[in-house]
Every structure is written in structure tokens, then in C-alpha cells.
Amino acid sequence: MKARLLILLCALSATDADTICIGYHANNSTDTVDTVLEKNVTVTHSVNLLEDSHNGKLCRLKGIAPLQLGKCNIAGWILGNPECESLLSNRSWSYIAETPNSENGTCYPGDFADYEELREQLSSVSSFERFEIFPKERSWPKHNITRGVTAACSHAKKSSFYKNLLWLTEANGSYPNLSKSYVNNKEKEVLVLWGVHHPSNIEDQRTLYRKENAYVSVVSSNYNRRFTPEIAERPKVRGQAGRMNYYWTLLEPGDKIIFEANGNLIAPWYAFALSRGLGSGIITSNASMDECDTKCQTPQGAINSSLPFQNIHPVTIGECPKYVRSTKLRMVTGLRNIPSIQSRGLFGAIAGFIEGGWTGMVDGWYGYHHQNEQGSGYAADQKSTQNAINGITNKVNSVIEKMNTQFTAVGKEFNKLEKRMENLNKKVDDGFLDIWTYNAELLVLLENERTLDFHDSNVKNLYEKVKNQLRNNAKEIGNGCFEFYHKCDNECMESVKNGTYDYPKYSEESKLNREKIDGVKLESMGVYQILAIYSTVASSLVLLVSLGAISFWMCSNGSLQCRICI
């Protein structure tokens, strides 16, 4: 009995066998990503796909300065409000920047027809040629071209008028019928602007135009309207009881526009040959101009980013990331980051790919840790790591390329009478925005899930590669590790790692050691059987003695009577 117990203890106290483990990289990263099934998964490496920062400034777009309207709006600039005269020298721009509450628009009160459509047209214009469509000094010899000024459009405390229009009035007591035409020979679209004056009383009508009933006719291939003055008492705006309505049209190359009137015409003086650009636009912003350059401008500030998404502003100009409402879009490129608990020892549960990664393996994503008489160490599997890096890099680049459709997204303009249309447009835009956001988030969630599964598969494949080489020359110990049945020096370990392990070379030694271990197991089973029988017999004897003692005591004090009958 003692001999058998001694054999068991000797077997249990044998030296540790050589061991090799398959595992993966871990580090001190705190990056977290979301997947379809999990939230806030800590990973070793990830890339951010969402830009959330800007510089708060208006910048040059690809080296071209914007047109800053300052205190003027689009109407004041294009009509030539005297307070906006300095803007007329600008011939080209990357985009137009307008402040939210610009004060200089139409100086003489009135309506600007189709103003929102004009803004939309100008949002795609990157330069124009300003030219005299009807030269001031020789186009209107029978009409007065100097009296048409007003205190409403004053400049430097003097009455003035729009710099692109002429207010024609009577000359020498008459206002002859006029007819003036222009043929577009600019080989570009030409923007033509004019106006119609509506006096507040008949006396002003007679004084200015020498007739009570007047008309203005404007005709081109695509435009045909006849206007009559509406003479009526109105509340004063900017000191004026009268009104001017402003109109515009685009004249195609080769087309002809004809103006006929016998009064009340605010005639074109300058027109604009338009050049359109793909990257232009109009933004409304309080941001100030700075000495900076960018590829993407928003009302909040410039974005310098190659990321596919941004959550700064839906209105963008230039090559910009797609706007989404997300607050986080991070794509995993590494592995689950589960550093091993070092206090649990090098081998055991922490060494495998099941419960934790290795912070000590820094030169690859997947690899090995071995222990033998010559020592221990980590080694990355460079081939599987590089294949994984290439695959994930290509995937990330593909996702960014597919989603990184950079473009200009300008706001749409609606007048006060189009409120229902504006509300409907907002709902449609919100719907598209929700779809874009959902698609972006779902794409990232799915790709993160696939990447983490991809890493798990790679570790498993590496494990199976080692298992298929070792076969029964080693045993699995259930944590990503194998315990050799033979001595495996560093050369042997290296052969396992590079896939050249010589199974027959170690088969005989492994077989002998395996049989010894199996013998010890059988011997141990015999010892355990003897101990079990001994324990059962001893327990039964103790129970019988105890019952006998109790019976004897009860008989002696009369508590138990025993009768023996023959």
C-alpha cells in the first residue's frame, strides 16, 4: 500500500513538460467599438470614421478665396446696393458667404420676384463677367438718367441708386415710348435684372412719367411678361410710400431680350455673363475669414479631413464628408483587447486564446509562446498577421472609398409663401438623413462583427495548424496550449511554428512517455480502489461497534429488554 502511494506521489512531482501555446496580441488600448451583438467592445486597434472637429473659420477653398458679402445679402450685391459697391469688383470666388442678418439688400422697398430661385442659380456660379448691357450715356437719349436717385439708397449721406440699374424718368416734359433689345453674344448664360416702379399716388406717376397709364413689357425666347404699375397708398418703408418690384431672367447664348415701356421701367444697366463651377455654393455663417486653406467648408468652420463622415453641419461646400447624425463611428482593425491577468501565471487559462491575449507579443497579432528547458519566449506568426493586416486594410479602404462620396450640400431656399413646401422638404431631408445615418451605423456594426470573427477564425486556424502537426506527440490542455510527450528544444519549437515539425522523429519518444503516463494512471486507479474498499469496511465496523455499545447501555438501565426464546 505504502509503495503504491509513493509511486503516485513521485509521478505527481515529476518535472513540467515542454509546452507551446497559441495566442493573440493584447495592449493597453482603451478603444471601444460597437458590433451588431455587443456594445463598447474594447479592441487593440481601431480607426475613426467620423469627423467632429472644425476650425471655426471661413477659409480659401482649394486656394481660391470666398466672396464675403459682409453686411450685404445676395439681393444687395447683385442689384448693386450703393452700400455693397465694393463687392462689384469681385469677379471669381470659391463660394459665397452671407451673414444671417445682413442689413443691406433691396434699399428701395419692394418684392424681389423668384429671389430664392435666383439664389439657387447663383449658388452654382463661381465667376462672372459684369458688363454694360445698355450703356448709360447712349442708350436712353430721350429719357433722364440722372434724376433717378432716392434717399432710401443713400451713400455717404447722399441720395443714390443701384449700381446695376437705371431709374429712367421724363425728360423735357415727356417720356417717349422706348424699345431696347440685346442679343446674347457671350457664349454663356447672361443674367439680366430690371425693375418696375409702383408710385404711391397719381401725382408722383404724372411727375415722373408724364402719364397715368403705363406698362413695361419684357420678352425673350423663354420669358414673356407685361407689367402695369399699381398705384396705391402704402405704409412708408425706409421713408418710401412707393414700391419697386425686381425681376430677372437668364438669357441663353444667341437669345434676344426686348424691353418696351412707356413709363415706370427700372432699366438694366449692367448684366452678368455667368460661369458655373461644380464646387461653388452659398452658405450663411457668422464665422470670420482667416488665412487658411481647406477642401471642405461648412457654416460652422472649415473641415480638413479625409474621413467619410462628419457630424458638424449638413450644409457643406467642397469635397466634404457625408453628414450623419451619429456621435460615434469607429471601425475595428485589431482584435478584442483582453489582456491576461498576470497573477494567474504564464501558463494555464491566461496563456490561451480563450481567456486572454498577450501584452508581451508586440510584433504581430497572432503567435506562440513556448516553454522548455532552454527557457521561454514569444514569437509572432508573421504570415497570418500580415495576411490579416492586408485583408483588413483593404476592407477599411474599400469602405471609406465607397462611403466617401464627397460633394457640396447647399441649403434650399423658400420664400414666406412656400412654408408648406419648406416643411415638406425638411421632412424629406430628415428622412434621407436618417437613412444615411442608419446605413453608416449598420455598415460599421456589420464590419466590426465580421472583423472580430475574422480574428477569432485566424487564431483557431493557427491552433488547428499546430494540432495537425503534433497529433498524438502532444496533448491539448484546453487553453490554447499543447504539452509535449517528448523533449522539444528551441529548434523543435521553431519547426512547429514554421510548419516543418518532424512528427516521425519524435513519435517513439512520445509513445514511451505516453505509456508511462498511462501506467501511472492505471496504478493510481488501483490505489484509489484499495482506498475506497478500506474506507467502506472501516466505516461499516465503526457503525456496528457504535450500535452494539448503544444496545448494551440501553439493556443495562432497563430501557431495552432482550428476551431469548428457545
From Swiss-Prot:
Q: Where are the transmembrane segments?
A: 530-550
One Gene Ontology BP term is: clathrin-dependent endocytosis of virus by host cell
Post-translational modification, briefly?
Palmitoylated. In natural infection, inactive HA is matured into HA1 and HA2 outside the cell by one or more trypsin-like, arginine-specific endoprotease secreted by the bronchial epithelial cells. One identified protease that may be involved in this process is secreted in lungs by club cells.
Residue numbers on the Extracellular membrane side: 18-529
**Keyword entries, A-Z:** Clathrin- and caveolin-independent endocytosis of virus by host, Clathrin-mediated endocytosis of virus by host, Disulfide bond, Fusion of virus membrane with host endosomal membrane, Fusion of virus membrane with host membrane, Glycoprotein, Hemagglutinin, Host cell membrane, Host membrane, Host-virus interaction, Lipoprotein, Membrane, Palmitate, Signal, Transmembrane, Transmembrane helix, Viral attachment to host cell, Viral envelope protein, Viral penetration into host cytoplasm, Virion, Virus endocytosis by host, Virus entry into host cell
Q: Which cysteines are joined by disulfide bonds?
A: 21-481, 59-292, 72-84, 107-153, 296-320, 488-492
List site positions: Cleavage. Answer: 344-345
GO molecular function list: host cell surface receptor binding
Report the SUPFAM superfamilies cross-referenced here: Influenza hemagglutinin (stalk) (SSF58064), Viral protein domain (SSF49818)
Parts of the chain on the Cytoplasmic side: 551-566
Highest taxon above the source species: Viruses
The residues forming the signal peptide are 1-17
Lipidated residue numbers (S-palmitoyl cysteine): 555, 562, 565
> What cellular component GO annotations does this protein have?
host cell plasma membrane; membrane; viral envelope; virion membrane
Specify the glycosylation sites in chain numbering.
27-28, 40, 90, 104, 144, 172, 177, 286, 304, 498
The membrane-topology field of this record reads:
Single-pass type I membrane protein
Q: Which cellular compartments is it found in?
A: Virion membrane; Host apical cell membrane
Q: Which family does it belong to?
A: Belongs to the influenza viruses hemagglutinin family.
What assembly does the database describe for this protein?
Homotrimer of disulfide-linked HA1-HA2. Interacts with human CACNA1C.
Another remark in the UniProt entry says: Major glycoprotein, comprises over 80% of the envelope proteins present in virus particle.
Q: What does this protein do?
A: Binds to sialic acid-containing receptors on the cell surface, bringing about the attachment of the virus particle to the cell. This attachment induces virion internalization either through clathrin-dependent endocytosis or through clathrin- and caveolin-independent pathway. Plays a major role in the determination of host range restriction and virulence. Class I viral fusion protein. Responsible for penetration of the virus into the cell cytoplasm by mediating the fusion of the membrane of the endocytosed virus particle with the endosomal membrane.
Q: What is the recorded name of this protein?
A: Hemagglutinin
